[in-house]
Amino acid sequence: MNLSSLPFRLLAAAVALCAIAAPASAERIKDLAQVGGVRGNALVGYGLVVGLDGSGDRTSQAPFTVQSLKNLLGELGVNVPANVNPQLKNVAAVAIHAELPPFAKPGQPIDVTVSSIANAVSLRGGSLLMAPLKGADGQVYAMAQGNLVVGGFGAQGKDGSRVSVNVPSVGRIPNGATVERALPDVFAGTGEITLNLHQNDFTTVSRMVAAIDSSFGAGTARAVDGVTVAVRSPTDPGARIGLLSRLENVELSPGDAPAKVVVNARTGTVVIGQLVRVMPAAIAHGSLTVTISENTNVSQPGAFSGGRTAVTQQSTITATSEGSRMFKFEGGTTLDQIVRAVNEVGAAPGDLVAILEALKQAGALTAELEVI
């Protein structure tokens, strides 16, 4: 693993702050679950950005940009001969994506993101020409057009040198698309409202059913599985909205999260949940450091000796081993004790990661170990 070398005391402090046990507090249903069917839908499209200051596609390497421009001009009544390939630098082929929010109606604006798909240096100062945005079913749900807002900067010289700040090949158009088609009504025709938890938990589902029945009467809600709660509701849309406005504000105490240890293998970050416990175990942990250095030696013969200068390589390999450290954990050892034991000997974050992995393999870590 390529782990960070930040001081472990800082890491331990951050972990301890994240794991401070807080008393269970009541949460609203709207913060724990979402209404089934009420979600956004992804839209995607293809288009052209024009008006760039020489930072567009190099059409010799992106012929589809020229083809797209010819097709667009043809639709506008301008015919470009088939054997003519204009070398443009102020046009860029782009991919467009947006999210169609739930209950969006025709005429409402939505934001769009525009990304270069060829070799444009920057989209700064460009304008997106009218482009349709389609859903997964192939239907057009919105039309996008407008001036781009680009947070980055990029420039390229004639010799191929390039400088860029942030990502100039991606921009956004606030309110850059207009909804043209509404999604089907998810509230029509059913006598139940489904609530889907953000995290599956049988305890939370059981408590949610009890809280809803306590507020609206016995038998109002039923548990479907570890994620879903079904609630009886009227079929009239207005009455369903009124029920939901009361339902989403019902409060309950969610179940405790499962014991889990999360390790980021790239940064060395370790997050340990407050319910993590360790079975009785003893650990010896040491480290071996191998250093290889290369030195170049030059052998220079004397003047008029007729010899040749020779270059030789000399390798030096050294290995150092630190003394093993012994850790002994009694049954029920908590997060604070684990961190304190490893921290007292001045260990690095990588040492804690290795110890946790070894404990998991030995069956002494009563938690899920997740490496991301």
UniProtKB/Swiss-Prot annotation:
Assembly with partners or alone: The basal body constitutes a major portion of the flagellar organelle and consists of four rings (L,P,S, and M) mounted on a central rod.
Alphabetical list of PANTHER family matching this protein: FLAGELLAR P-RING PERIPLASMIC PROTEIN FLGI, FLAGELLAR P-RING PROTEIN
UniProt KW Signal keyword: yes
A biological process term (GO) from this entry: bacterial-type flagellum-dependent cell motility
Recorded name of the encoding gene: flgI
Family: Belongs to the FlgI family.
Locations listed in the record: Periplasm; Bacterial flagellum basal body
Sorted UniProt keywords: Bacterial flagellum, Periplasm, Signal
A GO term from the CC aspect: bacterial-type flagellum basal body, distal rod, P ring
InterPro entries according to UniProt: Flag_FlgI (IPR001782)
Signal peptide: 1-26
Record protein name field: Flagellar P-ring protein
Lineage: Bacteria, Pseudomonadati, Pseudomonadota, Gammaproteobacteria, Lysobacterales
Function in brief: Assembles around the rod to form the L-ring and probably protects the motor/basal body from shearing forces during rotation.
